[in-house]
Amino acid sequence: SSDVCSSDLHVEHVETENALAASGVPYALLRNGWYTENYLASAPPALEHGVFLGAAGEGKIASATRADYAAAAAKVISEEGHAGKVYELAGDNAWTLSELAAELSKQSGKPVTYQNLSEADFAATLKGVGLPAGLAEMLADSDTGASKGGLFDDSRTLSKLIGRPTTSLAESVKAIL
């Protein structure tokens, strides 16, 4: 939730929301949770090296796909009755990075395990493989937030809004393999 989360990314979002509310322009806020694709981008090196790196511990991640979030935006834009509302959106079924590694293993037939790193070590690793410092630090910060419950939501607001279940982790992994 942008109301309670303290990560740098969420702080920036709160400032944007406050500016929008002060503008007087009619709005509806879609607070998208984490995107499944954010983690699936790391699947190729995880499959190559047999390890999925992160700093989320066993924190539950209620991610959804870009397509799921886009469907929600389309509904809100095309239907009446959403003005002034704030929607906290997330996937239906939360998972851990250990579970993601296991799903990659199951579907690919290759062994993949999850290795949890400290936030600093994860950021340094991401920088070491070429990510810009700001992005590496934001991703490591988000993972650390996930370890504390910052990427968990069980409200099912997204699936209620789009009128169907959100895309499962298994479906998402299948789509990239």
Regions found by a protein language model. Name each.
Residues 35-38, 60-61, 120-124:
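A short acidic, often aromatic-flanked loop/helix-cap motif at beta-alpha or helix-coil junctions
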Residues 28, 45, 62, 93, ...:
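Residues that recognize and position ribonucleotide moieties
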Residues 8-14, 42-48, 102-103, 129:
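Short, glycine/charged-enriched secondary-structure capping and boundary segments
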Residues 70-138, 149-177:
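Mid/C-terminal beta-alpha module of Rossmann-like enzyme folds, strongest
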Residues 45-64, 81, 88:
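A conserved pocket-lining segment of Rossmann-fold NAD(P)-dependent short-chain dehydrogenase/reductase
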Residues 1-6:
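Short, small-residue-biased leader/transition segments that mark boundaries at the very start
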Residues 15-51, 55:
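Conserved beta-loop-beta element that borders a ligand/cofactor-binding pocket
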Residues 7-14, 59-67, 90, 94, ...:
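Short-chain dehydrogenase/reductase
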